Amino acid sequence: MSSMTLFILFVSIIALLFLFINLIFAPHNPKNWTGKSINWVKLSNSGKTLKLLILSINRKVNCGWSNYSGIVISQKIYESIIGNRGSKSALLSVKEQRVYGSCTNNLVLRCTLVGLEISYQAKIPSNSINFKRNFSTLESKLNPSYISGFVDGEGSFMLTIIKDNKYKLGWRVVCRFVISLHKKDLSLLNKIKEFFDVGNVFLMTKDSAQYRVESLKGLDLIINHFDKYPLITKKQADYKLFKMAHNLIKNKSHLTKEGLLELVAIKAVINNGLNNDLSIAFPGINTILRPDTSLPQILNPFWLSGFVDAEGCFSVVVFKSKTSKLGEAVKLSFILTQSNRDEYLIKSLIEYLGCGNTSLDPRGTIDFKVTNFSSIKDIIVPFFIKYPLKGNKNLDFTDFCEVVRLMENKSHLTKEGLDQIKKIRNRMNTNRK
């Protein structure tokens, strides 16, 4: 045997020996991590393959960590089908991240990371969740029925008639579709603009913003939407009048005396009616009757989600209580307030949701309220997880869910838990900056 052959054989034996030692003692073998390394024991819940794994590179704002390297994978599954895999939580839906075992150079990542999601804090039945939606990593476009529900609460169909000597008849006539919100909901207004792909968003004051459409072509698109996805509050009458006015302007009828008078007659019964200037300028105007509206019926849950984003409230109240050991107790409420002209619609929510009650206010409004804790936990919270809010109010809902979780765990009966609830309450609704 030549010296070269002996050398190759020797090198091969050394290489095999080194590989064997490396497999036994190297840091990537969890059974032998000691000292400054993590003393790794195989997790009791490791075993079956994961239901879904995706790279977690782009995270939502609510996420508890950033994964710039892309070596962390995400898993979303339900507690009912989770088997031995994942974190056992009292909550239904858990957002979980695991690390590929091949990432041996970063020992810090050799653990299970659990982060916050909007739906994380709510304990709800598995069949109440939209399973497919949980796997989406992209912000979906607004649902058309959500848009109609939101506009039923916050939208305005405006007919403006202004004195203007530039026009032959001395009056300028414009139709506008407008949604005005606090600037905290600027992102929602931009989503609505993106949905319609017409109009503009303006910052009106330091605290308010507005989405506005007034071009004839743009209003055609707006009208097409609401013809297909109708309003169901009494606002549908204003919409029908608005549509009549828009058609007159499209046909240039506003440039004739007869057409202008017809538009003034519409203006007299839409929204707040004629202002003082118009009442003086057109004293003998023959007004028209407001259109009849169909009996309201909630056919799409996304409509209710949009309507609640506009008009709903998630309330946490801490009040004095003689029966509580701490001297204080917590009351949760889900509230929807509307003009009593929509009394039939608001009362129909009791049957639609299967909970709550209504009360008329002397000031001309009607309230729908859910205060029963079980109804809030088992009906209200699951509904808005499945049909999520899209505006700033979703932050209030997330906080509301956290309080529900604390109360379900009886934390409100301890001083620490009650203090935590007070802290959450103090950042909600009008206190949110």
Swiss-Prot record:
Compartments, as annotated in UniProt: Mitochondrion
Example of a GO cellular component annotation carried by this entry: mitochondrion
Major site of localization recorded for this protein: mitochondrion
Gene3D superfamilies reported in the protein's UniProt record: Homing endonucleases
Record keywords: Mitochondrion
Pfam families: LAGLIDADG_1
TM ranges: none
Entries under InterPro entries matching the protein: Homing_endonucl (IPR027434), LAGLIDADG_dom (IPR004860), LAGLIDADG_Endonuclease (IPR051289)
Molecular function terms, GO-annotated: endonuclease activity
Superkingdom as given in the UniProt entry: Eukaryota
UniProt protein name: Uncharacterized 49.1 kDa protein in ND3 intron
Organism: Podospora anserina (strain S / ATCC MYA-4624 / DSM 980 / FGSC 10383)
